[in-house]
């Protein structure tokens, strides 16, 4: 049996009184013992008060057991799931009514569509604040809509493909509006993902791709707008990828033989080209708005998607309108390239955003190359690209913009390939003698020489930039060598009847002269790439002696070629040292 404080104190006092013979001593001991008990009681009471907030913080408010909390949460999950299942049960009732024909099927279909959208609206109510409930109710809406549209379109034939596509479009817009107004993310996640997948599935099943591609383009437009307003997400990636797949399927199916798509409806050129071009316009316009107006950084997904959309647009034009469509697309590329360069200089380069600068620089160069190639004939294209290369290298060197120097190199290489300058140079130096070079080849060679003369190697450059200087130097060297060989052969034709051995000796002389000149000039002007080309030319001459002079030449001409090569081997290192001394 437990004793109270007063009983314990009384018994202690009695025992003390009983043991003490002097009453005054007993009173003193009793008083001290009572003081000690009061201090202990005070310490215990204040210790419990200090521990109470800690205990409340750890275990919750008083009167609430910790094992009751999971029961409360679990009790909220099961009613939500039950309500969702009730919604699915209602959908089955509507399905039974549609199959029984007791009511007009169109009326039942309209009620079913409204029923699915009502669940989407219910998921966005302010009272439904739990994320789990929003997910369940939005999922219930998608579970009702997807099979309902599938059966009403394919089984009952109540809806045409265009009607089903229109319903999906309204559903997508409703989800976007609810997300925008009430900021309920699960509504737009589930609503748009389900709408995109249902559109792709119905397009494949009905063979009517255009209506459902239109829905997918609407979804892409909605998400591009949401992304510009700072509300993008992973659902945007899903929607865009599904749209890419649908447009690629359209191009793949209709680019094949006609007998392989007998079940598909006939489509005109605009319907076949339009989806890819619209997707490219949507992605490109949104990308430009985000970068130029909102000053955002381009994401990796946006950069890759822009390339994919451009590839789809080009594929559609090349398959279904290779002539007139290519010219229109080329003009559009040139207009966009001009705007891209203006934006690059006025807005992007001053901001020093490296990724935006790289992406816009790549797009500017790519659009320029594509526009020139699709719009102009080969001779005019080569001339324009050569002139553009010279302009780019001059501006890039003066303003110290390495990206423009790279663009100039790309334009120069493209001009050389269009004019077939590398092929002509190889034939002149190692193959069969070709006819006299045309104006286009001469212009390409002159552009290569001027480009290399205008370029400037900076001290301490890394090897990628050194390669950028080496390529125009190679083009200039081989263009000069080919033109010199052609000129010497023309002069020699006045004196002798040219044979293979004459051609081999003239080629050897020209290459040795180019090697010696580049060796001295490279060390004299501090152009390391010229010195490298000088030694590379010696290796080329050695291979030429083995495969041409020794096989087709006469003894005296072989001796002359070997003499020239040996002399060049001796002279080139000395010229390098001589040029270095002159430079100092």
Label each PLM-derived region with a short phrase.
Residues 2-584:
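Alpha-helical multi-pass membrane segments and their bilayer interfacial helix-loop junctions
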């Amino acid at each position: 049996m437990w004793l109270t404080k007063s009983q314990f104190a009384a018994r202690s006092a009695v025992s003390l009184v009983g043991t003490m013979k002097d009453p005054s001593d007993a009173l003193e001991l009793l008083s001290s013992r009572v003081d000690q008990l009061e201090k202990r009681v005070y310490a215990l009471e204040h210790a419990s008060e200090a521990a109470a907030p800690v205990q409340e913080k750890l275990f919750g408010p008083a009167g609430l057991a910790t094992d009751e909390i999971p029961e409360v949460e679990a009790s909220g999950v099961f009613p939500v799931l039950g309500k969702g299942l009730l919604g699915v049960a209602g959908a089955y009732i509507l399905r039974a009514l549609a199959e029984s024909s007791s009511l007009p099927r169109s009326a039942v279909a309209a009620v079913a569509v409204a029923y699915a959208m009502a669940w989407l609206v219910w998921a966005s109510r302010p009272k439904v604040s739990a994320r789990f409930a929003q997910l369940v109710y939005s999922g219930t809406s998608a579970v009702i809509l997807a099979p309902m549209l599938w059966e009403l379109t394919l089984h009952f034939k109540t809806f045409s493909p265009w009607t089903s596509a229109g319903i999906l479009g309204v559903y997508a817009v409703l989800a976007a509006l609810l997300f925008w107004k009430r900021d309920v993310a699960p509504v737009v996640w589930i609503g748009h993902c389900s709408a995109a997948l249902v559109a792709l599935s119905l397009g494949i099943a009905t063979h009517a791709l255009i209506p459902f591609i239109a829905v997918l383009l609407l979804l892409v437009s909605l998400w591009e707008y949401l992304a510009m307003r700072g509300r993008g997400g992973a659902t945007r990636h899903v929607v865009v990828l599904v749209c890419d797949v649908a447009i690629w399927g359209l191009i793949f199916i209709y680019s094949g033989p006609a007998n392989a798509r007998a079940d598909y409806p006939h489509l005109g050129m605009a319907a076949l080209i339009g989806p890819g071009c619209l997707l490219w316009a949507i992605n490109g316009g949104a990308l430009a708005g985000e970068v130029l107006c909102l000053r955002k950084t381009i994401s990796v997904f946006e950069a890759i998607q822009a390339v994919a959309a451009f590839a789809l647009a080009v594929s559609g034009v090349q398959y279904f309108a290779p002539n007139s469509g290519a010219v229109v697309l080329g003009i559009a590329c040139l207009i966009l390239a001009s705007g891209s360069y203006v934006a690059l200089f006025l807005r992007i380069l001053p901001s020093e955003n490296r990724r935006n600068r790289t992406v816009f620089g790549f797009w500017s160069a790519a659009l320029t190359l594509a526009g020139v190639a699709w719009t102009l004939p080969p001779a005019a294209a080569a001339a324009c690209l050569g002139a553009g290369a010279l302009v780019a290298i001059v501006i890039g060197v003066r303003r110290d913009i390495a990206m423009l120097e790279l663009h100039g190199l790309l334009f120069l290489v493209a001009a050389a390939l269009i004019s077939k300058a590398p092929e002509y140079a190889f034939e002149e130096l190692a193959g069969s003698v070709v006819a006299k070079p045309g104006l286009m080849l001469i212009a390409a060679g002159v552009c290569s020489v001027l480009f290399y003369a205008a370029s400037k190697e900076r001290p301490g450059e890394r090897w990628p930039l050194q390669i950028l200087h080496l390529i125009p130097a190679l083009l200039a060297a081989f263009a000069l060598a080919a033109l010199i060989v052609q000129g010497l052969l023309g002069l020699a034709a006045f004196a002798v009847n040219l044979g293979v051995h004459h051609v081999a000796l003239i080629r050897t002389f020209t290459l040795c002269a180019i090697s010696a000149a580049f060796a001295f000039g490279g060390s004299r002007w501090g152009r390391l790439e010229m010195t490298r080309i000088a030694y590379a030319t010696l290796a080329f001459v050695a291979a030429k002696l083995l495969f041409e002079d020794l096989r087709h030449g006469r003894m005296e001409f072989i001796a002359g070629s070997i003499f020239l090569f040996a002399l060049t081997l001796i002279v080139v290192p000395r010229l390098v040292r001589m040029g270095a001394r002159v430079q100092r």
